[in-house]
Amino acid sequence: MKYKLFRSPGNLDKAIRKHELVAVEIGKNIDDVADALIRAVRDDLAEMPEYAHCETAAYAPEPIQEHRRVIRYQYEMMGVVYPQYAEKNILIDYGVIEEAE
């Protein structure tokens, strides 16, 4: 299976055409590529100039939640940016498309 990772500029359900392809991973199932997708999210956030000098993290892919309106993605992920001097962390939505090779 092929897994395409997209970063959302805001809410995962909105502005679908503005989502950016971040990575493509190949594996037997989502569990096989989960670590690579987590690394891709962390690297993507770390490379963004506005998040320079910030720590980053990512949650493992999960099936799209029922409240989501987007039908393009089969899985969703959350990237987290930990600014050094801020009251709140920054959360970034990612979507994952699963397709046959």
Question: Language-model features: where?
Answer:
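Short aromatic-glycine-(Arg/Gly/Cys) micro-motifs in beta-strand/loop hairpins
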Residues: 1-20
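Hydrophobic beta-strand residues in large extracellular and virion-surface proteins
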Residues: 3-5, 25, 33, 37, ...
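Intrinsically disordered, low-complexity coil/linker segments enriched for acidic/polar
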Residues: 8, 27-29, 87
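A short, exposed loop/beta-hairpin motif centered on an aromatic-Gly-Thr core
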Residues: 17-32
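Short, mixed-charge low-complexity intrinsically disordered segments
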Residues: 39-101
